Amino acid sequence: MCFRKSIVFFMLIATAILLSGCGKDKAQDEAGKKEPLPHRKVIIDTDTGADDSSAIILAAKTENVEILGVTVLVGNVDLDQSADNALMALEIAGSDAGVYKGAAVNASGETIEAFSVFGTDGMGDAGLINPKREAETQDAVDFILETVAKYPGEVEIIAIGPATNIAKAIERDPETMKKTKMIWSMGTTGLGPGNASPVAEFNVYADPVAYKEMLDSGINVTIIGLDMCSGDAQWTGEQFETLSNTNETGRFVARSFEKLREFYAGNGSESVMNCDSLAMTCVLYPDFVKSTLQCHGSCITDDGETKAEVIFYQKGFTYDTVENDFDYNVTLVGEVDKAKYFSMYLDAIR
């Protein structure tokens, strides 16, 4: 009997060890699993140059993202070219989202383009643009307002160009626009220097009046500034070669940056910023953002040396007083995981 009891005892011990091991493995497996990203309804508002195009492709290749439409405007290129570039990016990414034309000039009736940076077609002048589809007949502003009204509190507008279309939508129907879940803006210098002037970033400089309207609208705005796109976030020549050798999508993106790379090389830099795809990464992958700041953002619209500068009054600083009574109208991205940016983009388009 003692022998049998011993056998039973050891069998129970062995079973318990096995079960505890299985439980541990299961717990480790569960811990290793990431929660699926939530479904996102987005409108991409863009002046489609090479970096905008790469951002559209990133969004279209991200499974949990529903692109409700792409609204285009003048900026890097003229309005018609912006539409064709967006259509081509969607085609390359396998998306049938509609493209809607908006502003052909900024709020002051001017056009500020970037042919010298991105090429005359905005896509490196590499012969890439021959879309099979055409833009929709509905106006971009009408589309924005109709879509926000259809999905109140759900639509996120990802603004990777000047704010002209958004400002026009706010002017036309401010109450509907307040039902926007979030406007994500690739714009401003953040807390660093500018690229259109020492104090201004191109998207804001192209239409500071519209940018001010957006900031003052009462809509939730999160800003990804130019300062997030520098340093380790810049794409190197070696990384462009890797991108080109990945697949057809990667080759398209790499070729579209040829003029921009020439522009940077002329200024002594082998690596380039891809600001719009970095902004899109912030939007789509929350873990990429390491810190944010609550701020009051104020845009200068007057002509002069400070035109289009956006000043950020950060919450908790000495000027944060009862007398100032700031409306903290923006969330400013303060830090991102720059070193992971390129690999995250590469994984998304594979």
Walk through the language-model features, giving the residues of each:
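A residue-level signal for conserved active-site and pocket-lining positions in enzyme catalytic cores
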Residues: 99, 214, 280
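Bacterial N-terminal signal peptides that target proteins for export
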Residues: 1-9
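A glycine-rich helix N-cap at a beta->alpha junction
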Residues: 89, 93-100
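Bacterial signal peptide processing site
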Residues: 23-25
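Active-site histidine-anchored catalytic micro-motif
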Residues: 35-46, 50-88, 127-230
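C-terminal motif of bacterial Sec signal peptides marking the signal peptidase cleavage site
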Residues: 18-21
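Surface-exposed loop and adjacent secondary-structure segments within mature catalytic domains
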Residues: 100-131
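Conformational coupling and interaction surfaces
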Residues: 29-40, 58-67, 205, 209, ...
